[in-house]
């Protein structure tokens, strides 16, 4: 017998229900993983609310990534073995004691990568790919990172520093979070409740603007971001936490060669899964050498996923939130 968090109707965190279900059986080309921990992503919150397409049709199991030990192989799987520690992108949701995943979505873990760090798989890949694949960050450039104390944001700050960014400007929601992102390598910190981030960036850069902007907010944050994006700059949108659309006029882009780029790790999983493995290998190496650290902001029992969602929605924590089946 297995257990999972199931969403049968959209709504507040109380719709996250702990339910028994049959132990999943891996199909050909899949493996089954006994989960030791799974991460909470903001996309899970949006899926629960019904404002994001990640959840699919009701009912569904939330969650994008999981870490655990392989306990059964499906037919035709020869490159993996029972007992192997892995991170994975499951075929279904990850808020479960057992998940199945395609073999090509399984990423073995070395002894020096902890389960807790690996549970940030989606965030790690997103932070790396937004900076390097989407934005094509170059040494010496200025980077602006929204929600810099959050799961993706705190990793992006560190990765931008490793990539040789000349200046990292972090946008956060409180003074406590400002100290946190400075400790990760941010050069300048803007508290969004007290400052106009676009005006502050233009002042800090002498009017030249940021070369790269990572935007998980959308709406007017995207619109204002274009006013502090440097000529030939790249604004990468990888989320829409505001739930609001942005209105962009094309003259804003072509006259100064500014680019707005969309990015989704979920979309890569579906359409170009082979593109993910190189990114995973890079972030695994950075974790193994302690060049990159995943900050665990809070941990909850998997059965208490509702409390984890409440914690995230409170907007008070930093870093990654974990769920543990035990």
Regions found by a protein language model. Give the residues of each.
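NAD(P)H cofactor-binding loop motif with strongest signal on the N-terminal glycine-rich segment
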Residues: 147-148, 217, 240
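Glycine-rich phosphate-binding loop and adjacent beta-alpha segment
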Residues: 172, 181, 220-291, 325-326
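Mid-domain Rossmann-like dinucleotide-binding core that forms the NAD(H)/NADP(H) cofactor-binding site
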Residues: 81, 119-194
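Glycine-rich beta-strand-centered segment in the early N-terminal region that forms part
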Residues: 22-40, 51-93
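NAD(P)H dinucleotide-binding glycine-rich loop of Rossmann-like/cofactor-binding domains
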Residues: 46, 85-149
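C-terminal capping/lid region of NAD(P)-dependent oxidoreductase domains
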Residues: 284, 289-298, 306-326
